[in-house]
Amino acid sequence: MATRLGEKLHELRKQRGLTLEKLAELAGLSKSYLWELEDRESQRPSAEKLTALADALGVAASYFLEEDIRAPEERHLDEAFFRGYQKLEPDAKEQLRKILSTFKKNS
C-alpha cells in the first residue's frame, strides 16, 4: 500500500505524462527507487531526493508533505473559483448554491 507521498508522486507523474524511467532520469534517481516510493508504505526519501523529485515535476517540495492530494493546478482552480464566489452578490451566490446542489443530487 502506498503512502500519501507515494499517491501524490504517482498522480503528479501521470498528470505530467512521465514514465517511471523518464522521471528517474530527470530527478537523477533509479526507476526501482521511484517504484518503491510510489508503491511501498515505508519509504521516506531524504530532503535531497524529495527536492530532486519536486524540481523534476515542477512543484515545491512542500507539495509532497501537504495533506491535500490534489495537484497544484487543481487546487489553484478551486481557489480561483472560491475567490470568484466570494465576490458575487447574495442572489447570485444563492443561484450558484442551487445549481451545485442539483449536481450533488445527480452524482
Predicted segments with their positions:
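Recognition helix of helix-turn-helix/homeodomain-like DNA-binding domains
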Residues: G28-P45, E66-R70
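Short alpha-helical DNA-recognition segment
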Residues: G17-L37, A52
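Residues that mark the N-terminal boundary/hinge immediately upstream of a DNA-recognition element
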Residues: K8, T19, S46-K49, A60
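DNA major-groove recognition helix of helix-turn-helix/homeodomain DNA-binding modules
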Residues: G28, E48-Y63
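Interfacial/linker helices and their anchor residues that mediate assembly or domain coupling
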Residues: I69-S107
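A short, Lys/Arg-rich alpha-helix, primarily the initiator
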Residues: M1-Q15
